[in-house]
């Protein structure tokens, strides 16, 4: 069994459901410390974070390449639906099964082993290697990567390159990498009416009826046309609640939850202003609370994307696709202190599902791609 596969299994065996790290970072820290990394634990409200860095011969003047990832996994769902226990690594039909196999314990193991091989081959490497690891990516993400980024900002620390080990591939390893992500902004809208008997609508104000025309306009709105890198901004309703459950009561209020996934073609302030303008146009009595989960970020083609594309082609023969589709990731926080952030990891077809798995044939090539990038950028 390869060192990468063995470490992957060791990490999968830890039931590290958010925010419980279950000592995964301790396993990583022991191996990184043996390589000469300075390892620092950053704890926050039950979340465990790791910042580990190994400087090269250029010291602080050298380029710094960081790997960012998370040790936490999503809950398993019904255990009886799993073919084998989710935290007992199992091999079947050329696949390794277990919660976190694809998202993202294989990536964690691959970069640790890549760093070990790189340091052994290049003991006098010029640039620096760092790990930014959290146990709060799958949850609220309020005490994880963002806290480490804030700490690094306070120290004036800057990263030159960052690879986030998210499972970006689809059918084959390396067919897709993410060089950006859309922003995410949610709204909690309460439209006020007047409760009353449904037989006497003239004595009440039905908030659902009041909201409906504005809702139709919001759903039909073209927020932007996107751009070269991003699809158009989308607006979607996630929840609509009103009423007591009775058939003869007009509700006193209607509650709407919605979400924007927005590109760099729009701004937070601009989208908020347009929503308020539509609601005000329909003369609604409302309150609206906004939550911005992350801003869009984009890494144009440059040293990191070139190195990653070259490494993927050399290892797999594939020409990779740069993409900004999908949900948010911790890359949105890291982009504040790093001009080049790209996400790359194994295929994502089974993530967050029963019987999550990774094809074993992808494990060593993933490690090799990571090692090739280290060699190209900081050796």
From Swiss-Prot:
Cysteine disulfide links: none
Annotated EC: 3.5.1.18
Cross-referenced InterPro entries: ArgE/DapE_CS, Bact_exopeptidase_dim_dom, DapE_proteobac, Peptidase_M20, Peptidase_M20_dimer, Peptidase_M20A
UniProt keywords, alphabetically: Amino-acid biosynthesis, Cobalt, Diaminopimelate biosynthesis, Hydrolase, Lysine biosynthesis, Metal-binding, Zinc
Source domain of life: Bacteria
Keyword hit for Protein biosynthesis: no
Cofactor: binding comment: Binds 2 Zn(2+) or Co(2+) ions per subunit.
An individual GO BP term: lysine biosynthetic process via diaminopimelate
Binding site for Zn(2+) 1: 70, 103, 166
Amino acids binding Zn(2+) 2: 103, 138, 352
Entries under CDD domains matching the protein: M20_DapE_proteobac (cd03891)
UniProt keyword annotation of Chaperone present: no
Cofactor(s) essential for the protein: Zn(2+); Co(2+)
Pathway(s) this gene product operates in, as recorded in its UniProt entry: Amino-acid biosynthesis; L-lysine biosynthesis via DAP pathway; LL-2,6-diaminopimelate from (S)-tetrahydrodipicolinate (succinylase route): step 3/3
GO molecular function: acetylornithine deacetylase activity; cobalt ion binding; succinyl-diaminopimelate desuccinylase activity; zinc ion binding
Quaternary structure annotation from Swiss-Prot or TrEMBL: Homodimer.
Family: Belongs to the peptidase M20A family. DapE subfamily.
HAMAP family: DapE
Function (record text): Catalyzes the hydrolysis of N-succinyl-L,L-diaminopimelic acid (SDAP), forming succinate and LL-2,6-diaminopimelate (DAP), an intermediate involved in the bacterial biosynthesis of lysine and meso-diaminopimelic acid, an essential component of bacterial cell walls.
Protein known as: Succinyl-diaminopimelate desuccinylase
Primary gene name: dapE
């Amino acid at each position: 069994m390869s060192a990468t596969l063995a470490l992957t299994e060791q990490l999968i065996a830890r039931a590290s459901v958010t925010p419980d790290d279950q000592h995964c970072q301790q396993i990583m820290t022991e191996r990184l410390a043996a390589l000469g990394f300075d390892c620092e634990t950053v704890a926050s409200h039950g979340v465990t974070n790791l910042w580990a860095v190994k400087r090269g011969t250029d010291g602080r003047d050298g380029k710094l390449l960081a790997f960012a990832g998370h040790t936490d996994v999503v809950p398993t769902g019904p255990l009886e639906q799993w073919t084998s226990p989710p935290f007992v690594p199992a091999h079947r039909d050329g696949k390794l099964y277990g919660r976190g196999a694809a998202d993202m314990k294989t990536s964690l193991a691959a970069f640790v082993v890549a760093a070990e091989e790189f340091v052994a081959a290049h003991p006098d490497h010029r640039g620096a290697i760092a790990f930014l690891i959290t146990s709060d990516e799958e949850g609220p993400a309020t005490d994880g990567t963002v806290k480490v980024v804030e700490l690094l900002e306070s120290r004036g620390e800057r990263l030159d390159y960052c690879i986030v080990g998210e499972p970006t591939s689809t059918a084959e390893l390396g067919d897709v990498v993410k060089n950006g992500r859309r922003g995410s902004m949610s709204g909690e809208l309460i439209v006020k009416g007047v409760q009353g008997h449904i037989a006497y609508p003239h004595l009440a104000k039905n908030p659902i009826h009041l909201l409906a025309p504005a809702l139709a306009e919001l759903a039909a709105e073209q927020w932007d046309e996107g751009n070269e890198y991003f699809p158009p901004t989308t607006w979607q309703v996630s929840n609509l609640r009103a009423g007591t459950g009775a058939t003869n009561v007009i509700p006193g209020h209607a509650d709407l939850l919605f979400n924007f996934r927005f590109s760099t073609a729009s701004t937070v302030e601009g989208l908020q202003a347009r929503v308020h303008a539509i609601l005000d146009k329909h003369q609604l009595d409302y309150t609206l609370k906004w939550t911005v989960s992350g801003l869009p970020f984009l890494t144009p083609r440059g040293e990191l994307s070139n190195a990653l594309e070259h490494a993927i082609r050399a290892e797999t023969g594939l020409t990779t696709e740069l993409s900004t589709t999908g949900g948010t990731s911790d890359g949105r926080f890291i982009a504040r202190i790093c001009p080049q952030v790209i996400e790359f990891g194994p295929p994502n077809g089974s993530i967050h599902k029963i019987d999550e798995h990774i094809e074993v044939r992808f494990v060593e090539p993933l490690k090799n791609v990571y090692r090739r990038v280290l060699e190209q950028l900081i050796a």
